[in-house]
Design a protein with these regions (language model features):
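Conserved small/polar residues in nucleotide/adenosyl-binding loops
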Residues: 2-11, 401-407
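Glycine-rich, mobile lid/loop segments that gate access to catalytic sites or pores
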Residues: 98, 169, 174-356
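C-terminal catalytic subdomain
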Residues: 369-371, 376-403
Length: 411
C-alpha cells in the first residue's frame, strides 16, 4: 500500500503546482487512501508545507485548529467520489447485449426473398448473368427495379407471386396476397460502364462491380459460431413459422375448422446478460411480436367490449408463446444454453397489445434494410452493403461465401 513517504511527495508537488489550498485537499485524499488500505497506524497529517517534515515525526509542532477542520472538510467533499471509483474498479459490473431478428413475412424480408428468387432464376438459366435487383412491397403492390444483363428469359411476375404465396400471404384479408397484388417492373439492362469491369474471359479473373467493406466475425457462444442473442432470435422465429404451418398449436376454431391464428409477419429480440469476462450468464429478456388473426369476437360494438376482446387475444398469445413456443425452442438447444433460462426471464409478447395489421400492408418493405439481422446481430463490424438480389460480381454477398464462411469453419 501507499506509504507516508509518497504522501509527503504528493503534498510537495501539489503545493508547487497548485498552491496551498490544493495541497490540503490532496492531503485529505491521501489520508482517506491510507485508512481504506488499512496500512496500520492511521496518521493525522494536518500540515502545511512548512511543518510537513516535523509532522511526519509525530507532530512535534502544534497543530492549528483550522488545519484539522480543512482536512475533514476535504474528506467530506471527496469521500463519496473516491469510494465509488475505488470500489467500482475492483468490482466490474455485468452488462447486457441485444440482437433482433425478423420473420420471412416481415415486409423487408419479403422484399429480400423476391430479389433473391429473381437472382436465382436468372443464374439457373444463365450462370453468367449480371443482376442487381431491388424490390419494394406495400399494400397490394410490388415494385421491381434494378439492372440485369442475361441471356435468360425470366417471368418476373410469376417468380414474385410464387415467393409471396410460399411465405403465406395468400388471403385477401391481409391486404397483400399473391394472387391479387399488382406487380410493376422497372428492371433494365446493366450499365455498360459497370459491365466492362466485371466481364472476364476466364472465370477465375472475375472483376468486382464496385468497392466495398466486409467484416467476418465468429465466437464460441453457439455451435454455429454466431452470437447467442442473434442465434436465439432466429430460432424463435424459425420455430414460430413451423408452428404456423403445422396449425396444430396456437390455433382457434373458425367456421368449425381448427385454424392457426398466426400470420406471417413477426419479430423477435433477445437480450443476454454477460459477466465481466464476456461470458453469457443468463437470458435476460425476450421480446416477441407476432401478427395474428382477430380470433376473439367482441360481445358488442362498444369500446369496452373491443378492449376486452383484445386483452383476451393478447393473454392467449402470451400463454401460447410461454407454454408452446419457448419449450420447443429450448428443447433444441445444447445443455449449456438451456441453463441460461431461469425464472427471472422477462418475456414481452406483442407489447403494443394488438398486431392484426401487419406485413406489407402495415409497413412498406425494401430490399437490403435488414443487414444487421443478416450478419451478426450488432456484434463485429458491418460495411453497410446488403446481400439480396446481387450476382457474384457484387462484393457484398460473395465475400461472406468465399471468405468469411471458410474462416468460421476453421475456428
Amino acid at each position: 500500500s501507499r506509504g507516508l513517504g509518497d504522501v509527503y511527495k504528493r503534498q510537495i508537488l501539489c503545493t508547487l503546482f497548485f498552491g496551498k489550498i490544493a495541497n490540503k485537499f490532496a492531503f485529505a485524499l491521501d489520508l482517506y487512501y491510507l485508512c481504506s488500505r488499512k496500512c496500520g497506524r492511521i496518521w493525522l497529517l494536518a500540515t502545511t508545507e512548512k511543518n510537513a517534515k516535523t509532522a511526519l515525526r509525530g507532530f512535534s509542532k502544534p497543530v492549528r485548529l483550522y488545519q484539522i477542520t480543512f482536512v475533514f472538510v476535504g474528506i467530506a467533499v471527496f469521500l463519496p467520489s473516491i469510494m465509488y471509483h475505488y470500489y467500482s474498479g475492483e468490482k466490474p459490473m455485468n452488462y447486457l447485449f441485444t440482437s433482433e431478428s425478423v420473420s420471412e413475412g416481415h415486409p423487408d424480408k419479403v422484399a429480400d426473398q423476391i430479389s433473391d428468387a429473381l437472382l436465382d432464376e436468372f443464374l439457373a438459366y444463365d450462370p453468367n448473368s449480371k443482376v442487381a435487383c431491388e424490390t419494394l412491397v406495400t399494400t397490394g403492390q410490388v415494385v421491381l427495379a434494378g439492372e440485369v444483363k442475361s441471356n435468360a428469359y425470366v417471368d418476373l411476375m410469376e417468380v414474385a407471386r410464387r415467393v409471396i404465396h410460399r411465405i403465406g400471404y395468400n388471403k385477401s384479408s391481409y391486404k397483400f396476397d399473391a394472387d391479387s397484388c399488382g406487380i410493376f417492373s422497372a428492371i433494365h439492362e446493366q450499365s455498360a460502364d459497370i459491365n466492362r469491369g466485371v466481364e472476364r474471359a476466364e472465370a477465375m479473373s472475375q472483376g468486382a462491380g464496385d468497392q466495398g467493406m466486409m467484416f467476418g466475425y465468429a465466437c464460441n457462444e453457439t455451435d454455429n459460431y454466431m452470437p447467442l442473442s442473434l442465434d436465439l432470435s432466429h430460432l424463435l422465429l424459425t420455430e414460430l413459422a413451423v408452428i404456423r404451418r403445422e396449425a396444430s398449436a396456437m390455433t382457434y376454431l373458425r367456421k368449425g375448422k381448427v385454424t392457426s391464428y398466426l400470420r406471417p409477419d413477426s419479430k423477435s429480440q433477445v437480450t443476454i446478460e454477460y459477466n465481466e469476462r464476456n461470458e453469457p450468464v443468463r437470458v435476460h429478456t425476450i421480446v416477441l411480436s407476432t401478427q395474428h388473426d382477430e380470433f376473439v369476437t367482441p360481445a358488442d360494438d362498444s369500446k369496452e367490449a373491443q378492449e376486452a376482446a383484445d386483452r383476451e387475444m393478447l393473454q392467449t398469445i402470451y400463454n401460447d408463446v410461454k407454454q408452446v413456443l419457448l419449450p420447443r425452442v429450448i428443447a433444441q438447444l445444447p445443455e449449456r444454453v438451456r441453463t441460461l433460462f431461469d425464472d427471472q426471464l422477462i418475456l414481452l409478447v406483442n407489447p403494443t397489445g394488438k398486431f392484426v395489421i401487419g406485413g406489407p400492408h402495415g409497413d412498406t418493405g425494401l430490399t437490403g434494410r435488414k443487414i444487421i439481422v443478416d450478419t451478426y446481430g450488432g456484434k463485429g463490424g458491418h460495411g453497410g452493403g446488403a446481400f439480396s438480389g446481387k450476382d457474384p460480381s457484387k462484393v457484398d454477398p460473395v465475400s461472406y461465401t468465399h471468405l468469411t464462411l471458410p474462416t468460421i469453419l476453421r475456428v
